[in-house]
Amino acid sequence: MRHRFCSLLSFFASKKKSPQLELPEDICRQFSLAQIKAATNNFHPDSIIGTSYFGSIVYKGTMDDGTIVAVRRCGGSSGGGVSELQLNEVKLLCQLRHPHLVSLIGFCLSEKEMFVVLEYMSRGSLAHVLYGKDHVPLAWKHRLHICIGAARGLHYLHTGAKHAVIHHNIKSSNIFLDEEWCSKISDFGLSKLLPLSTSKALTRIDTDHAVGTCGYMAPEHRVRLLKEKSDVFSFGIVLYEVLFGRPQYDSTLPEEKQYLLDWAMESLSQGTIYHAIDQYLKGRIAPECLNKYL
C-alpha cells in the first residue's frame, strides 16, 4: 500500500499538460467507451439519476456482467474537458477501500471526457433521504446508524493510511446509502492526500479562492488552510441536518433560522434546542441520548 501512496504523491507533483491515467488492471478496471455506452443505453436521458460536482451527469448503468453501477460523465459533456480534479478522484479512490466509502469500479478516459464507474447506491444521498421530495421521516435509531457509518468512513480517511486524506467536501449530498442503508462517503474530486510531514498539521489549499460547499466549510478555508478538523467541522453540520431534518441553508425560513449552524447555536445557548429539532423526532429521543449527541 505504501508504494501506491508514494506514486500518488508523484502524480500530484507532476505538471503534465495532457491528463494521463495509467493504473494497473488489478487496482482499477479500464472500460472502453463502447462498454460505457452500452451500459447507459447510449447515455439515454431515462438513465440519468443525478448530478455531481462541476455539473457532471450521473447515469445508472448495467455492465456486461450484470453489475448495476453509477456512471459519472465528466468533462466533455459540459465543454470543459477532463480536469486534474477529476483525475484526482480516480487516482485517490484506487488507493482507498473501506465499507463506508463508495467503491470505484473503473473508469474510461477518452480524448475530451472521462467516465468514472462507481458502486451504485440505490437509496440515493443522505440529503435526499432527510429532506428530499416525498421523503419518509427516518427513526432516530436509523439516523444514528447512518451517522456512525459515515463517521467510520471519515475516520478511515484521516487515520487508516500512512498519509491522511482530507475529503474537503463533506456534506449530506456526498453521503450515499445502499439498499441495506449502509452509509458511504463519495465525491473525492476536491480531496487532498497530505504528505507524511504534514499529516497532522495545516496544509495550504493551492487555489486563489476557497473551494468546497458554502455552509459546510470550516473557518480556516477563508485563509486557504486545510486540516483533518476541517472535515470534522463539515461533518458536524451534517449531524445537525440529521437532527433538524433540514438543509444547512433554507431561504424559505425566517431570517434567523435560515442558516442551520447559527440557528442550532442560538437554540443551544437559549436551551430551546429540543423545540427546534425535526418535529418527527420530538418525543422519540431520550433526553440523555440527545444530550450525548449534542
What is the role of each PLM region?
Residues 2-294:
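Conserved eukaryotic protein kinase-like
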